[in-house]
């Protein structure tokens, strides 16, 4: 349905929806009482999943006799997969395999409410939670009565993460130099067209931000080997004191910042001074506080670098833009909401009297007009190729950590994915790359001796010919005593690579068939994809050619054992259980090893490389600010998004409903002793509720009153529980913002919840992302958006 034709149809559809909601009880059904509580989870985070498993285990250990046990029902596909699965079970009235609880977003409550399957948490104490984070329950359509239907157990918000070294390079080149109004001489990091005229404002906020930008560049410049820049310093010693003064900026133009600028310049290229762009522009900290100024500044920067505005067909190794946006629906929703004064009456739709009202957008009211303004601001940046948007799993942090973006807007839950390690490693595919995934094993080529250098051990010749490669995984089936014994057994055990050694075991990859003596899932995986097979074989042949001379030399010197060992260590691919996305080119899905809870991928056609630290963004080099909270700088209200899954109840039957609420109350209110899993706290324990344990484990925040009431919230809760080296600055910023929400200092935004809100969100995001690629104008964007919505809205 297209809005410009469909006023009558649209109103009719909403009326029909209201009727369906009112008649929801007709679709209500009871589930079979099977004596257990099922919790549906589609979590993709390993830390969150492990925490949930620990919680279920703990509850089943401490529950009273006669209380129902709880178990996890795993759903694939993330939150969208969970939404689809629930809708299907509601539609078919699944009485036997449905669940009692689900971790997902509150629009599912509306889906349940349409058929009377929502479960209010009437017997759950929620008084420990800040009421501001429960009021979204007042904005859920189709429910039968007011109440608490969703409980936020893992909140996050969005931050603007600035790549300090990159922004320093941009501003340092654009800045007016002290005493150089007509000075042509430039530093070695500047090009012939880069004599800057930009000025930095002197207000307190801007001065503080500029110092942070300087400090991040210094830290980045220090990260490589010391002394590299000192030679260049000596060469410049012939400059007179006057010349040195002229080439210095008001900031500390130290060797460290110069090292950083020089490194960034390698990928960003020369700064170009352009009339009406950054020429005579005044840089202020307030630029990052509102959408209009942020997008205007970003567009100006994009126009100043040829590698951005002249490149409309970016490859993975290219600079991706100035601004990265991980969730375009979030950015569009919050900017339009802010432009409407933080009032849901001025938003795309609102929930009123239990019904969703989309008339504001349909009638081209304030939300439509504000969307047009916001889109216009984005359009300038889009046209100059200055924005990167996440189109399905490729997050801004994947590029920002390699200096390919100046700043990005992303979730506070992504802190541990946002920065490079001290030794930044990635897999390069030639024209693109990915950061070296966690939980990754190297795939070794089979040796001429047999399976990875071992004797045949009864395997057939065909089995050897079918062998593509091997990798090792931890052998969880081996008793700890055996592992300890093997660790002390010396070099002989460690060299026995083809058999179970230490706490590892070898997994064999075969084509065509798995030979006798090997078992699929236990110690073998059958590779079926022809592309994977060919690339593994090709990599093995390539390695053989490269090492022929060396292997021959080793044989001549009668060092055959060393040659065999070297041959067996050839890397021809990688395999991981981390959440990397299949691309059908270099990354493919393969079968899991028995006991694994996460999908396994195989990565082929990649070369591992380790970069200098100055080529990457470390957490201490990022400047973390709130995502823009206003549309215009002068707007009276500041807006912050709150997001994250809720625990949602589903009607089953009288007994299971009571047992479900009993578990949720325990989850929120019963302190238990939990063993910590983080490296720095391994073996230690802490007493806290299951909800607190879950939020901490998953890098989320539980909106407890006591947290927001403390004056030292930032320092107490900002410390990262996973490593002593890094402080979770994203969590610090989230707590700071949530505290302001709790104290009514800023306005919280979350999507009004309707059974159609998920489709509305998905459609506006997909259509905007397509407009970024096609550079569509606003009219075309709206036309495509409404067409995508179809008759559902």
Swiss-Prot record:
PROSITE patterns: PROKAR_LIPOPROTEIN (PS51257). Pfam families: Lipoprotein_10, Lipoprotein_X. Residues 212-227, 247-264, 472-485 have a biased composition (Basic and acidic residues). Residues 181-200, 212-264, 444-504 are annotated as: Disordered. It comes from the Bacteria. It is found in: Cell membrane. It is a lipid-anchor. A lipid is attached at residue 23 (N-palmitoyl cysteine). This is Uncharacterized lipoprotein MPN_506. It comes from Mycoplasma pneumoniae (strain ATCC 29342 / M129 / Subtype 1) (Mycoplasmoides pneumoniae).
